Amino acid sequence: MTSFKLVKYIPRIKKKKSGLRKLARKVPTDRLLKFERVFKAQKRIHMSVFKAQRVLDEIRWRYYEETVMILNLMPYRASYPILKLVYSAAANAAHYRDFDKANLFITKAEVSRSTIMKKFRPRARGRSFPIKKSMCHITIALNIVKRSK
């Protein structure tokens, strides 16, 4: 009899390409001012990470005006807090750094897990049922781009 050794299959994970390659397709890197950046983070948003990620994937690497239009027309509940966050980041960039809103470009839009709020729901016969409400942190980074006229 031949015995076979069972080996756990480990798939190879491809490294993600850097975001600058994606950015280079939309905006030439010579026009992107790397150090002219504004960050805005919102913490403990009562929303699943996956629901927020679906919206953030649509707005990443887009201009501010285009992003606002997309978020206004999206049918998802997750788009409203993200819209407020993008508005706030653009207002901060315009007020504190004197950036023009027409030249703002979203270079970073990421979501991370936050704490899970645990509650208990009373059930029949004196039992209780756990309810887990997930929360997330969302970070937006806006760069200024020199547009060619």
UniProtKB/Swiss-Prot annotation:
InterPro entries, per the entry: Ribosomal_uL22, Ribosomal_uL22_bac/chlpt-type, Ribosomal_uL22_bac/org-type, Ribosomal_uL22_CS, Ribosomal_uL22_sf
Major localization listed first in the record, in broad terms: plastid
GO CC entries: chloroplast; large ribosomal subunit
Compartment annotation: Plastid, Chloroplast
Paired cysteines (S-S): none
UniProt-listed Gene3D superfamilies: Ribosomal protein L22/L17
GO BP annotations, alphabetical order: translation
Highest taxon above the source species: Eukaryota
Molecular function, one GO term: rRNA binding
Record keywords: Chloroplast, Plastid, Ribonucleoprotein, Ribosomal protein, RNA-binding, rRNA-binding
Pfam family, one: Ribosomal_L22
UniProt function note: This protein binds specifically to 23S rRNA.
Family stated for the protein in its record: Belongs to the universal ribosomal protein uL22 family.
Complex and partners: Part of the 50S ribosomal subunit.
Protein name in UniProt: Large ribosomal subunit protein uL22c
